[in-house]
Design a protein with these regions (language model features):
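Generic amphipathic alpha-helical segments used as scaffolds and interaction surfaces in large
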Residues: 17-31, 72-82, 241, 286-289, ...
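Glycine-rich phosphate-binding loops that contact phosphosugars or nucleotide phosphates
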Residues: 90-93, 97, 105-264
Length: 407
């Protein structure tokens, strides 16, 4: 059997594959990791069963339940997922169908999402990556006045629904963005509250403000959903439904992948193999960076999303046993083939202090023009991916390739 075949994880029914042949996990390495593998499988089962995962805050971590509420450990938690989900879908449908309208316009045409970190990165990624026919999406994700006014001045204010997202309701950047937006609406003669939606914890500062000021809608964010993993919660689903995304399909895709990555078989579990590859590449301490190279314009924000998800999750001074480890994985990236004209030169010839994650999207929806005999732009894109991966491999640089059918 070829090295490629040995190191391939493929889910044909999902159209997804992961190629570890440029960062191979041999039997000797897997054997040396068996104790950690067994613990990870056991800890994952405990986590999804409701074990306390955050010892500092004494709370569960339940973002996995969002994709399949049947996994929630209590009926109350299941209801806390199903109820808001139904409410989100109904709200989005009513906005897009024109049943919920702004006071001074026939229908909403735009949505302004105000948030930061996980409250913005996930929704921004979905808005940028998934084509849909709903509202035009805009974001305030910083406290830079110039950036905020640039966005605000481009909005059709009377047709804009504002979604303010903050778990605690007291995040300074989000609060600042909300106050600036409120002031901008007022100065332009448009009422803010009737066009405003809050996504926040029950009883938070934002929740109380929205209630007192008579905002259009409030959606509850649970304390067992962390910001960086909240894209499948109301945090991500409210903007997604307004954008016109079929959130049932979004959740179903995540659920199907969850099922594939709960198998105790290491060689057929993509999540476990990714974790092992990261461990091997970084010597278990984050000694190398991860460079994310999606060869698709629609995924240009994916590296930013992964940057928070991975670095905030793994960047720790102490491990769960209380040992000082000061470890993590630094993540950066942009998109291919743009990166080939930016920093791939250093990746190939400079310090070998990274491993790469290539993301291949096999199909293009608009690719009919031949730019050379028998070759389209999409063919060139695929060729650049394969050529860059091979050039890095020839220079002793490790990589993983994730292949998906489309976005």
């Amino acid at each position: 059997m070829s090295l490629y075949a040995q190191q391939l994880v493929r889910y044909p029914e999902l159209g997804i594959s992961l190629d570890f042949s440029k960062l191979p996990l041999d039997d000797a390495f897997l054997s040396s990791m068996q104790g950690r593998i067994d613990r990870a499988f056991a800890d994952m089962k405990a986590l999804e069963s409701g074990a306390i995962a955050n010892p500092d805050e004494k709370r569960m971590v339940g973002h996995y339940w969002l994709r399949n509420s049947a996994l929630a450990p209590t009926p109350e938690l299941k209801a806390a997922i199903d109820g808001p989900l139904a409410d989100v879908k109904a709200f989005g449908r009513d906005v897009l169908d024109g049943k919920i309208t702004p006071p001074r316009a026939e229908q909403y045409s735009a949505a302004l999402v105000i948030g930061i970190g996980g409250s913005a990165l996930g929704p921004e990624l979905v808005a940028d990556a998934i084509p849909a026919a709903g509202l035009d999406m805009f974001f305030l994700d910083n406290t830079d006045p110039d950036g905020m006014y640039k966005v605000l001045e481009s909005l059709p204010l009377e047709e804009t629904l504002v979604v303010v997202i903050s778990k605690s309701g007291g995040t300074p950047e989000t609060r600042n963005g909300m106050l600036v937006a409120q002031d901008f609406f007022k100065k332009n003669g448009v009422e803010f509250a009737p066009q405003a939606v809050a996504v926040t914890g029950v009883g938070s500062k934002l929740d109380k403000t929205a209630e007192a000021e008579g905002w259009l809608k409030r959606f509850p964010m649970e304390d067992w959903v962390g910001g960086r993993t909240s894209v499948m919660s109301v945090v991500g689903l409210v903007p997604a439904v307004l954008q016109g995304v079929d959130v049932d399909e979004l959740l179903e895709g995540a659920r199907l992948m969850d099922e594939k990555t709960r198998q105790d078989c290491v060689k057929c579990n993509a999540a476990m193999k990714l974790a092992l590859a990261w461990y091997k590449a970084t010597n278990g301490k984050g000694e190398k960076d991860m460079v994310v190279l999606p060869y698709k314009d629609a995924l240009v924000l994916f590296s930013k999303y992964l940057q928070q998800l991975i670095m905030e999750s793994l960047g720790k001074r102490l491990d769960l046993d209380g040992n000082e480890v000061c470890q993590g994985i630094s993540v950066y990236g942009n998109k291919g083939s743009t990166d080939q004209h930016a920093y791939v030169q250093q990746l190939r010839d400079g310090v070998n202090n990274f491993f790469a994650t290539f993301i291949e999207v096999r199909e293009c929806s608009a690719d009919a023009v031949e730019v050379e005999a028998g070759a389209t732009c999409g063919d060139f894109l695929q060729g650049f991916l394969r050529g860059t991966r091979q050039a890095l491999a020839e220079s002793g640089r490790s990589s993983i390739t994730i292949s998906i059918p489309e976005v």
